[in-house]
């Protein structure tokens, strides 16, 4: 009897030490096999997927509220003018990424197989309707907004509280930061159950629809990766060339090789900060500048996240046969860019902000969270590529802006 306990503990420790990516890959393989061997059993495991989606729905609103409040309240922007062009490039890059994602989604629309039983969508017909809906959603009671998943109001209250708390005492700001960390830790616990949830979702999906759903996911991944490659290899080099008037590709390829590859496997912009710092030193950039711009970039430079939010939101709209005008898509790009800045440091952060963007099209929380769950299924590739783009771009823009400053 005594020998069983150490063996059980060893098994649990082994599971804990295995990366989440590996667990998700194993879950997808096992779910696919179960769906082929015993479709009825696979459908029964669909409950695990439903539990996971409901857990995401529970944590997402309070996460966005506290995260945005803390990020703004504790933001310490350096007064040095040298940072202004870098920050400007960060926002330009993020907005450009969202626009590229819109164009690719228009050219290659993705429709997903979703459970639409009881789902509602009240798509706006004109841009004026979108703006009117936004205005009314913004002024909702914060408690009601969190309870009902009104992410527009949640974001507005987060911004309002954050700017108000910028002038609060350091102890008050510290308390908000601690609360943000606590909520983030709860989210990490939920994400740890992602392999079980994804097992249930994949098993039920394949048992119900066959392997056609996985074909949809491959199309979705192709659109996401194409948008990220266009930003990394075309848009970012163009921005660097306009600033430096030099061939941008030696810098871009150096950053992709020395920062992007590491970030691809760590899947964390924050964890990649030391790598980026060392690369900036190797590139002989000003330490006073990059010591601030790199950590700042890990927080607000979120081109990959903007692409993920935009592509998956438009996929949800197409799945519900919602007509998306170009003007509304541009508004989505702006919302996705702003939302992406709050995705840093949170497990599945960009995915959990999708409901916020979906609310622009009147898509309810139930459908939005199904799209989030699909995001976790493809997250093995999506999150790695997203982080690689985000982190390598931090150095690309820091180097380009530093060159511009030196020239002046």
Swiss-Prot record:
Gene3D superfamilies: Sodium:dicarboxylate symporter
Record flagged with keyword Cell membrane: yes
Keyword terms: Amino-acid transport, Cell inner membrane, Cell membrane, Membrane, Symport, Transmembrane, Transmembrane helix, Transport
Gene Ontology CC: plasma membrane
Listed Pfam families: SDF (PF00375)
Annotated TM spans: 19-39, 48-68, 86-106, 143-163, 193-213, 223-243, 294-314, 322-342, 367-387
Reaction equation(s) it catalyzes: L-serine(in) + Na(+)(in) = L-serine(out) + Na(+)(out); L-threonine(in) + Na(+)(in) = L-threonine(out) + Na(+)(out)
GO BP, sorted A to Z: serine transport; threonine transport
Record has Aminoacyl-tRNA synthetase as a keyword: no
Coiled-coil segments on the chain, per record: none
Record InterPro entries: Na-dicarboxylate_symporter, Na:dicarbo_symporter_sf, Ser_Thr_transp_SstT
Topology versus the membrane: Multi-pass membrane protein
Gene Ontology terms for molecular function: neutral L-amino acid:sodium symporter activity
Subcellular location: Cell inner membrane
Family: Belongs to the dicarboxylate/amino acid:cation symporter (DAACS) (TC 2.A.23) family.
Its job: Involved in the import of serine and threonine into the cell, with the concomitant import of sodium (symport system).
Name of this protein: Serine/threonine transporter SstT
Phylogenetic classification of the source organism: Bacteria, Pseudomonadati, Pseudomonadota, Gammaproteobacteria, Alteromonadales
Gene: sstT
């Amino acid at each position: 009897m005594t020998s069983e306990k150490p063996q059980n503990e060893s098994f649990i420790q082994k599971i804990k030490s295995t990366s989440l990516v590996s667990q998700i890959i194993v879950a997808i393989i096992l779910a696919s096999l179960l769906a082929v061997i015993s479709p009825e059993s696979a459908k029964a495991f669909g409950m695990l997927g439903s539990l996971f989606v409901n857990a995401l729905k529970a944590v997402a609103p309070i996460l966005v509220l506290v995260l945005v409040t803390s990020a703004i309240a504790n933001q310490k922007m350096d007064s040095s003018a040298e940072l202004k062009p870098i920050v400007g490039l960060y926002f330009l890059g993020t907005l450009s990424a969202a626009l590229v994602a819109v164009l690719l989604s228009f050219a290659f629309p993705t429709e997903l197989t979703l459970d639409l039983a009881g789902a509602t969508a009240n798509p706006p017909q004109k841009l004026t309707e979108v703006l009117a809906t936004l205005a009314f959603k913004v002024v909702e009671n914060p408690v009601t907004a969190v309870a009902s998943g009104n992410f527009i109001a949640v974001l507005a209250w987060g911004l309002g509280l954050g700017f108000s708390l910028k002038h609060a005492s350091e102890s008050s700001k510290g308390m908000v930061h601690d609360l943000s960390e606590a909520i983030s830790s709860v989210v990490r616990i939920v994400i740890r159950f992602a392999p079980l949830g994804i097992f249930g979702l994949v098993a039920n999906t394949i048992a119900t629809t066959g392997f056609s759903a996985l074909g949809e996911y491959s199309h979705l991944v192709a659109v996401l990766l194409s948008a990220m490659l266009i930003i990394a290899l075309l848009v970012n080099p163009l921005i660097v060339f306009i600033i430096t008037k030099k061939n941008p590709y030696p810098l871009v390829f150096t950053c992709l090789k020395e920062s992007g590859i590491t970030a691809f496997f760590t899947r964390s912009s924050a964890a990649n900060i030391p790598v980026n710092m060392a690369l900036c030193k190797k590139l002989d950039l000003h330490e006073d500048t990059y010591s601030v711009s790199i950590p700042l970039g890990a927080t607000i430079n979120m081109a990959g996240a903007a692409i993920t939010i935009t592509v998956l939101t438009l996929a949800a709209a197409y799945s519900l046969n919602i007509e998306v005008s170009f003007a509304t898509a541009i508004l989505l790009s702006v919302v996705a860019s702003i939302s992406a800045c709050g995705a840093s440091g949170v497990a599945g952060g960009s995915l959990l902000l999708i409901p916020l963007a979906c609310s622009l099209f009147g898509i309810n929380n139930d459908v939005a969270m199904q799209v989030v769950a699909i995001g976790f299924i493809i997250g093995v590739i999506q999150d790695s590529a997203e982080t690689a783009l985000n982190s390598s771009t931090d150095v690309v823009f820091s180097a380009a802006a530093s060159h511009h400053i030196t020239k002046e």
